[in-house]
Amino acid sequence: LLSIKPEWWEKILAGEKDLEIRKTAPRAGARGTEPWPLLVLAYVSGTGAVLGQFLCMGWVKSNCFRYLASRSCVPAEDLEKYAGGKSLYGWIVGEAEEYETPSPLAEFGLTRPPMSWQYIEIPDDKEE
């Protein structure tokens, strides 16, 4: 489950953003047990709900902020400040889908969204 700002979610859905920038990288599936791609649920900030999902095809680690900016829609200066002297991880965004009906966090056993992201168990009735 990934917390994401509304403007970034819209750019992912529009195909304009193919890297989602984070300070840490996911493993394929919880505890590395599932193969890639990794299913990522998108909690959109301010909505109180999961609005959709995308496939994370893998990730890149880089401190070349111009490269990351070109694929993430985030200005290089902002990325450099966010990185704090370290490399960042670009989660490679694959196929994205917006749900017809948003899913409240409570459906996933959560009372609040993660600060950045976290692994969760998906209820059986939510799996495709």
Name what the model sees in each region:
Residues 1-128:
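Structured alpha/beta reader/binder surfaces that contact nucleic acids or chromatin modification marks
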